[in-house]
């Protein structure tokens, strides 16, 4: 394998055996591709904004004399970039400008004569833009639009599984679901009549809809039934025979023909009888007259001579009717063929219960059902029915819906109209009747072929269309109002409804979520999440077990592990690693094609529907060198079942072992040894890990760490290869390789790094360079690490030396005992950044003022404020400190004589304002790292605001001029090269000032042209610099766009350093979570024979019952990795020659049975080997991919190579007594995470505070500054102890005895510690509740 210079710094040893056929795809593509589709101009008009515009325009006036046509659209440039939007609290969006054409036709002239055309660009609101990382910045906060898994449009056949009716009869139904429009349901009732519902309203007999489609009873029967024809010959009744129809019936008379009896009366007709009849080609048989009684006629029979209706279609025949028919000359009678087995009389029965008999009465019936209480007119009824399913404005199946619809009805073509046709409705009814007759199967709703993904682009497009439809109505009104000659397109379009619809979707839709930004993994997972909830989806309460369950079609599409615990389990899922959506929005997953028993590297993406037709082998099937399966019988999946197939039956093979799981689960090493429930917790808890101060790569990983870190966008990644020309904490400059440059550019890439900014979860985002000056980099190399990344690999926690043993009860019930060394080394120290804002408003009594001149406050309290009343940067503040001094005008009050005197002496100011500072919340302390002041346009800026502005301007100028210098240097080096090659002497050239170089002329014409081009570029560069500087200056100095009534906003950022402490929650990656019980001195911790103490002691009882053995294997492998690191460290300390180092490291990389990774250190230079060794000192990082990881034997070999016991257990000594523990203990390195459930955020106490209005008890919870609940069980405890006075105090004065607590307060102030309990308020509430039931209950004094 070829490694780039950067990748050679630290190579992760990979234990994977299966070859990597397909690289992990870009993990955010589901978001980015979908939004790209929405924004991109699509000439076909199938997707995105283009589709929305084309579906609504052209808009015609009611009279048809004018229309507004759509021509094209363009998106402008956003005003602020992403960072500026976040700081200012605005939305990152671009203006949408649409070119519209107003066409006015001549009124009197013939159709289509144009009188006037006006074209104009119209502003249609702002469209939020997606950042490069798949997020949106809405009002300054980063949000993610989660994809939705909803029922695909199309037709579904289902049954109630016998649950509706008490008899347990299975009732079948069919439902046509459009993309937008009314739902159409057909269903059977227990009496086997077929009914129809529209939009889940009252049901009607299904034949009503056929009558409304203009079918007569005769035509209806003709569509759904086969005929049995009887003929009257010579006063005998003959029946046309189709032998197949007789199968399974019992003969009610002798079946004979040509004198031969085929079936005797009372015998069951079998297949043998039918074969005999067919062989003898019997077409007619004679039947007794009684046989026709009860049969149903299929059409109307009229007496030709009198015109009288003898018998109507769908009437039952009787012998009298037969005689009448015979008399009136009808010798051929057609009846319906029905039987109980597979030709039920459902439609015939339904026609009987149908109260309507013609089209109009059917339409009226439908109108009454849809609009109860309105008087129906013919026109209203017709237009309502027409608009339900047959109008493109109101109904759309969409391309997906039509495809699913036609596939379900087994039609050949998959394209067609978006509205329903007569045939569509009839075919659905026919298939439903077939299913009721026992032919065909019902659909599985939870099959991923029946559920599709709606991503950002599609949802945004739908919202945009909603806005356009609102505008359409208004435009129609305007077009019909006359005076069109003076109107322009922009006078008709009001952009408000459009931007309101878009804003509502991005701001407050259930699927637009505040991004989970704890760490890079939680960002990626959030963007890859798939929710079944949301508008048009399920609701938590209604979702049953089936929907939440893992379905066979989830394989390789949706992760079976990662889903939340709790009420949302199974409704919110995560996309599998390799899954993607196809053009219709169905999830598909890649497979390797198998041709003639040979596995090829050809890759096909299959959706859940296509997959059902193939036999698919698993990724861990053994192959020989040619790609044949080794075993004769291979474990495969087919039609959702897993079983053994012979190797020549296999069609496809999985691409990778981690194809099944999501990104989160693919980061858990030895996942295959963990119980599913614990793996779920492990995957979920990795998302809650807080980035530590110094990231530490996992010693035992899965090889996915690099992909996650790079794709998450928290690192700086090289866009093009080159060499590092400049690097400092906030900027990296790369001089691009010649072959990757665009013609005529300076060839310099500048990467500005993010420093100490706040994430959505108040964690700290900070980037640090991981390249040094002069290093070569390649495209895609990581240049700077972000939060939780280490040399371009995801690093959520720390590698800790753990021992599995009980220790004095401090690890009872999953508690964790931690060594003091962990705190000393700041291993789990995290930085949290909080934003506190102070808003100065314009009140009725005058404006609030931010000032340091505050009445009645001591000097000490204001010591950290500057003269503008705002805290200094760098000040260390604690709970209750003033950050911003703000005073609010106070209404005039009646003054006492003393106050009047004071006013007269000291002037006005002192008493007409009250203070309303911004203080540090209780329990928070930290350092002020940044202050920002936003001032409304037209309000004078205070001194601090001007200082900040000046600083920002200076910084911007410095940044830009540095950029310019770098680019200039690059340009001049190229100019110099041209001049030197054109014959100018280098020494003379270097003596000339650089600005004069461009004045030189060269004789070589080609070189002179190059020189002129470079000169042009130089001028352009300077011009560009001026422009950028001016734009920056304008942005910094302009006033801010604040909410109405707001004059100023001051934002103060506090950085809080949190060390690990008892009460913090920690976890491993296998769902093994616990709370820190004690931080133990180093000298008390258990230590090994070398005197190395362990860092963490875990309880071994946490393993067997939870069945997450992965943690034990991880511990062993971590120990081996560390052992090898220790040996390398020792060799480096002894300064052994590079050859020995190279040989030892090579041995470590080669270890393992047929691993796929081939590292050849002979191609590395000595420096590269030394640098690799330096990075392996703390342990050799190892990858053990999911389901393809290290085997037990390999772990033992690695332990042996590191000179460690192969059992993985060592003898420990008690740190307090020095005695040896009685048996060896499992010790090793486990990757531990600190979760964002910190005791500092949960710790809370209250003395006095707010009360609930009704019960007068203190509120609950930290957010409300509530009290501690003294609940039912606590009361029992005091009762059991007989602590009567304590109990009384708890339930009265400390809770809700209003008078008692006031008296108590007064007593304490007076120094008298007596208490007088009274009536608790909650007792009065109880009395009132009983009275509200009409029971008068009174308390009487004795």
Swiss-Prot record:
GO biological process, one term: DNA-templated transcription
EC number of the protein: 2.7.7.6
Keywords: DNA-directed RNA polymerase, Nucleotidyltransferase, Transcription, Transferase
One Pfam family it belongs to: RNA_pol_Rpb2_1
Signal peptide as annotated in the record: none
Record field: catalytic activity: RNA(n) + a ribonucleoside 5'-triphosphate = RNA(n+1) + diphosphate
Keyword hit for Magnesium: no
Record's function text: DNA-dependent RNA polymerase catalyzes the transcription of DNA into RNA using the four ribonucleoside triphosphates as substrates.
Family label: Belongs to the RNA polymerase beta chain family.
Complexes and interactors: The RNAP catalytic core consists of 2 alpha, 1 beta, 1 beta' and 1 omega subunit. When a sigma factor is associated with the core the holoenzyme is formed, which can initiate transcription.
Protein name, entry field: DNA-directed RNA polymerase subunit beta
Taxonomic source organism: Salmonella typhi
Gene that specifies this protein: rpoB
């Amino acid at each position: 394998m070829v490694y780039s210079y950067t990748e050679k710094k630290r190579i992760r040893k990979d234990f994977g055996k299966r070859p990597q056929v397909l690289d992990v795809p870009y993990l955010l593509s589901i978001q980015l591709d979908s939004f790209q589709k929405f924004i991109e101009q699509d000439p076909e008009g199938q997707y995105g904004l283009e589709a929305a515009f084309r579906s609504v325009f052209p808009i015609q006036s009611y009279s048809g004399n004018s229309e507004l046509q759509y021509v094209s659209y363009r998106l402008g440039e956003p005003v602020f970039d992403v960072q500026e939007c976040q700081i200012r609290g605005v939305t990152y969006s671009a203006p949408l400008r649409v070119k519209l054409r107003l066409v006015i036709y001549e009124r009197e002239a013939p159709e289509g004569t144009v009188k006037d055309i006006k074209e104009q660009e119209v502003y249609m609101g702002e469209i939020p833009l997606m950042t490069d990382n798949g997020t949106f910045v809405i009002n300054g906060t980063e949000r993610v639009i989660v994809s939705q898994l909803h029922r695909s449009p199309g037709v579904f056949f289902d049954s109630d599984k016998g649950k509706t009716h008490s008899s347990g009869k299975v009732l079948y139904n069919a439902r046509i679901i459009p993309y937008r429009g009314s739902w159409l349901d057909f269903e059977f009732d227990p009496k086997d009549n077929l009914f129809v519902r529209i939009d889940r309203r009252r049901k009607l007999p299904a034949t009503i809809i056929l009558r409304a489609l203009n079918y007569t009873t005769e035509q209806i029967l003709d569509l759904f039934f086969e005929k049995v024809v009887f003929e009257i010959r010579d006063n005998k009744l003959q029946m046309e025979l189709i032998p197949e129809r007789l199968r399974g019936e019992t003969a009610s008379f002798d079946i004979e023909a040509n004198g031969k009896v085929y079936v005797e009366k009372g015998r069951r007709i079998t297949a043998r009888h039918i074969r005999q009849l067919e062989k003898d080609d019997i077409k007619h048989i004679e039947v007794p007259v009684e046989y026709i009684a009860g049969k149903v006629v299929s059409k109307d029979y009229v007496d030709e001579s009198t015109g009288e209706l003898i018998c109507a279609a769908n009437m039952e025949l009787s012998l009298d009717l037969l005689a009448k028919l015979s008399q009136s000359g009808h010798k051929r009678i057609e009846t319906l063929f029905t039987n109980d087995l597979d030709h039920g009389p459902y439609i015939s029965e339904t026609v009987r219960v149908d109260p309507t008999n013609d089209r109009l009465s059917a339409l009226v019936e439908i109108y009454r059902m849809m609009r109860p209480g309105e008087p129906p007119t013919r026109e209203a009824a017709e237009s309502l029915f027409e608009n339900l399913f047959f109008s493109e404005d109101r109904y759309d199946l969409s391309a997906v819906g039509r495809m699913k619809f036609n596939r379900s009805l087994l039609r050949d073509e998959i394209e067609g109209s978006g509205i329903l046709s007569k045939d569509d409705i009839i075919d659905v009814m026919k298939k439903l009747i077939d299913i009721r007759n026992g032919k065909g199967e019902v659909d599985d709703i939870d099959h991923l072929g029946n559920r599709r993904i709606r991503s950002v682009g599609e949802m945004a497009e739908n919202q945009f269309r909603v806005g356009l439809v609102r505008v359409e109505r208004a435009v129609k009104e305007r077009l019909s109002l006359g005076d069109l000659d003076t109107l322009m397109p922009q006078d008709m379009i009001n952009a408000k409804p459009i931007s309101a619809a878009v804003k509502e979707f991005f701001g407050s839709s259930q699927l637009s979520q505040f991004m989970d930004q704890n760490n890079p993994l939680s960002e990626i997972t959030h963007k890859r999440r798939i929710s079944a909830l949301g508008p048009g989806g399920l609701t938590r309460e209604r979702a049953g077990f089936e929907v939440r369950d893992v379905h066979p079609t989830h394989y390789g599409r949706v992760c079976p592990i990662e889903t939340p615990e709790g009420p949302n389990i199974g409704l919110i899922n995560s996309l599998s690693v390799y899954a993607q959506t196809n053009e219709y929005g169905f999830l598909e997953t890649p497979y390797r094609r198998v041709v003639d028993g040979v596995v090829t590297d050809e890759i096909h993406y299959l959706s859940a529907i296509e997959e059902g037709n193939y036999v698919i082998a698993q990724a861990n099937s053994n192959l020989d060198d040619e790609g044949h399966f080794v075993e004769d019988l291979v474990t495969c999946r087919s039609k959702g079942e897993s079983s053994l197939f012979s190797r020549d039956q296999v069609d496809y093979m999985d691409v990778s072992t981690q194809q099944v799981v999501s990104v989160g689960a693919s980061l858990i090493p030895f996942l295959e040894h963990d119980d599913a429930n614990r793996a779920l917790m492990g995957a979920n808890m990795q998302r809650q890990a807080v980035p530590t101060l110094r990231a530490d790569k996992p010693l035992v990983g899965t090889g996915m760490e690099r992909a996650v870190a790079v794709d998450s966008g928290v690192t700086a990644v090289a866009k093009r290869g080159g060499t590092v020309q400049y690097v400092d904490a906030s900027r990296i400059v790369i001089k691009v390789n010649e072959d990757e440059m665009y013609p005529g550019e300076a060839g310099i890439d500048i990467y500005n790094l993010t420093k100490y900014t706040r994430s959505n979860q108040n964690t700290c985002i900070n980037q640090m360079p991981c390249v040094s000056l002069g290093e070569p980099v390649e495209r895609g190399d990581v240049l700077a690490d972000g939060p939780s990344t280490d040399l371009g690999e995801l690093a959520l926690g720390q590698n800790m030396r753990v021992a599995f043993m009980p220790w004095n009860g401090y690890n009872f019930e999953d508690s964790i005992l931690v060594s003091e060394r962990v705190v000393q080394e700041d291993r789990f120290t995290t930085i949290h950044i909080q934003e506190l804002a102070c808003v100065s408003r314009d009140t009725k009594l005058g404006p609030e003022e931010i000032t340091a001149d505050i009445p009645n406050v001591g000097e000490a309290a204001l010591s950290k404020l500057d003269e503008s009343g705002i805290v200094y940067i760098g000040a260390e503040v604690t709970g209750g400190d003033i950050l911003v001094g703000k005073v609010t005008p106070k209404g005039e009050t009646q003054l006492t004589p003393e106050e009047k005197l004071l006013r007269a002496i000291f002037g006005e100011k002192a008493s007409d304002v009250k203070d309303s500072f911004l203080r540090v919340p209780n329990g928070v302390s930290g350092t002020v790292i940044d202050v920002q002041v936003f001032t409304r346009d037209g309000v004078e800026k205070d001194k601090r605001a001007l200082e900040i502005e000046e600083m920002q301007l200076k910084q911007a100028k410095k940044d830009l001029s540095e950029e310019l210098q770098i680019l200039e240097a690059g340009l001049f080096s190229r100019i110099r090269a041209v001049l030197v090659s054109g014959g100018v002497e280098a020494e003379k050239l270097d003596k000339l000032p650089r600005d004069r170089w461009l004045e030189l002329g060269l004789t070589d014409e080609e070189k002179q042209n190059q020189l002129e081009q470079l000169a042009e570029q130089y001028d352009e560069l300077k011009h560009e610099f001026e422009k950028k500087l001016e734009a920056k200056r304008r942005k910094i100095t302009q006033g801010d766009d604040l909410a109405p009534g707001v004059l100023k906003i001051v934002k103060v950022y506090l950085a809080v350093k949190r060390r690990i402490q008892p009460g913090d929650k920690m976890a491993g990656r296998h769902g093994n979570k616990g709370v820190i019980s004690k931080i133990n001195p180093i000298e008390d911790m258990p230590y090994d024979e070398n005197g190395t103490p362990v860092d963490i002691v875990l309880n071994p009882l946490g393993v067997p019952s939870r069945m997450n053995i992965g943690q034990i294997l991880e511990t062993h492998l971590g120990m081996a990795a560390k052992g090898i690191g220790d040996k390398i460290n020792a060799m480096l300390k002894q300064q052994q020659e590079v050859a020995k180092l190279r040989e030892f490291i090579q041995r470590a990389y080669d270890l393992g049975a047929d691993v796929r990774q081939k590292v050849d250190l002979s191609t590395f230079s000595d420096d590269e080997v030394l640098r690799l060794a330096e990075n392996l000192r703390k342990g050799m990082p190892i990858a053990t991919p999911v389901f393809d990881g290290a085997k037990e034997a390999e772990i033992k070999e690695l332990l042996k190579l590191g000179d460690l016991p192969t059992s993985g257990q060592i003898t420990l000594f008690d740190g307090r007594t020095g005695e040896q523990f009685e048996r060896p203990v499992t010790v090793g390195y486990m990757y531990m995470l600190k979760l964002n459930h910190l005791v500092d955020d949960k710790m809370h106490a209250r003395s006095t505070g707010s009360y609930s209005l009704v019960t007068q008890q203190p509120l609950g919870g930290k957010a409300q500054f509530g009290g501690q609940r003294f609940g039912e069980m606590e009361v029992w405890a005091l009762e059991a102890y007989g602590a009567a006075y304590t109990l009384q105090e708890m339930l009265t004065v400390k809770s809700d005895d209003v008078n008692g607590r006031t008296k108590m307060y007064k007593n304490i102030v007076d120094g008298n510690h007596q208490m007088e309990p009274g009536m608790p308020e909650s007792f009065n509430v109880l009395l009132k509740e009983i009275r509200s039931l009409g029971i008068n209950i009174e308390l009487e004094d004795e």
